[in-house]
Amino acid sequence: MAKISVQDEVEVTEPTLIDGFPGVGLVGKIAADHLVETLGMTHHANVHCDGLPKVAVYHGESAALQPPVRIYAAADRDLLVLQSDVPVGPDAAAELAACLAGWFDAHSVTPIYLSGIRTEKGESPPELYGLGTGDGVDAVTDAGIDAPGEAGLVSGPTGVLLNHAVESGRTAVGLIVECDPRFPDPEAARTLIARGIEPLTGVDVPVDDLLERTEQIRQAKERLAKRMQDAGQESSQARPLGMYQ
């Protein structure tokens, strides 16, 4: 079974979708959760695909159960966010990519996929890089986001989704941010939003509290981060390719 079931009709025109799958540093997950919360986005749809974990999730403020992968919408901003509360392996991501493709085409959705690249934390802010397929290449350039400057690859579920975009000739954007692989990294998520998502979408998102709430966010995401570390290669991440493999 593969379907997207609408929960609350929201009118959007050629929207941009932000991918929030958990990966290294939980950068995409933190950024997506922040967008949903800060922008007061509407729970628009649920995603049902065979490869996704068959679990029900709940959040502390509500007794309502939900599926683990959901789509939120902000009609006034033509923005969608794909929120996932569980790690998703590459096999499941391949099914998910096929599941989402028709829906993306039907609604003229442009996806932005988020990944972290492992780096040692220093004093300077994390670097952000952009990649694209189709019109996504020009979108990254027009937003002033630099290419990585070296060969590399994106693995895990985000890599599968980007690969599907390449194979099918669809437009997509990939954002890669330097992050701490050992802990959830709100600073890297802040960079994704402020220097990547904002210029690409034109949506203004307050991000200062991401740094102010670093310890709170890390504690809340610690258990999921441990599960992602245990998953190893299944985590979404970018990494450079050396000359010799």
Could you tell me what each predicted segment is?
Residues 1-107, 167:
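N-terminal catalytic or cofactor-binding beta/alpha core of small enzyme domains
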Residues 43-47, 113-114, 174:
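General beta-strand structural signal in soluble alpha/beta enzymes
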Residues 87-137:
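Internal, conserved structured core segments that host functional sites
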Residues 120-196:
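Catalytic cores of processing enzymes, dominated by hydrolases/peptidases
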Residues 176-245:
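Extended, histidine- and acidic-residue-enriched regions that form the cofactor-binding/catalytic faces
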